Amino acid sequence: MNFGLQNNIKMNTIIEEVKCPFYHVVGKEVEVFEQVYQNKLPILLKGPTGTGKSRFVEFMANKLGKKLITISCHEETSSTDLIGRFIIKGAETIWLDGPLTTAVKNGYILYLDEVAEARPDVIVAIHSLTDHRRELFIDKLGETYKAHDDFMLVASFNPGYQRGFKELKPSTRQRFVALSFN
């Protein structure tokens, strides 16, 4: 699905009804995820590359029967890429929702893979979605959207993965229920 992103933006955006992937449950991660989902909280998956974080999110989206939007974050991922932008269509300018706005409005699971790699404005954009407000403010429209009851924010990162790696601030991490993968 094209969210109106320019060709020079390297973003892997997928909206899908996930086919049931294989995932080997190793602890209470399924129960924790289900409780977090039921309580409308965000979850942060921490762990090194290859520990099954992305596979787990796909597995849980399938188990819950929810659509999943996956964003592979990188150093150029901006809040505009996630929220949306104005585009020219014919003789008019129209607003095109980004994947975050789409997930918030429609009750999808949004997975921000490697969120610490994204630009700082991404963290600012999701800030009010990670607390009791569960709201998305779109500055360019001057509008605030209350998250759909089924919306869930999932983020992952690899703490201490490599030298020079961007870390999430403690003030950001404390807004999420954390689940470690080893």
Predicted regions and their residues:
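AAA+ P-loop NTPase catalytic core and its hallmark functional loops
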Residues: M1-N182
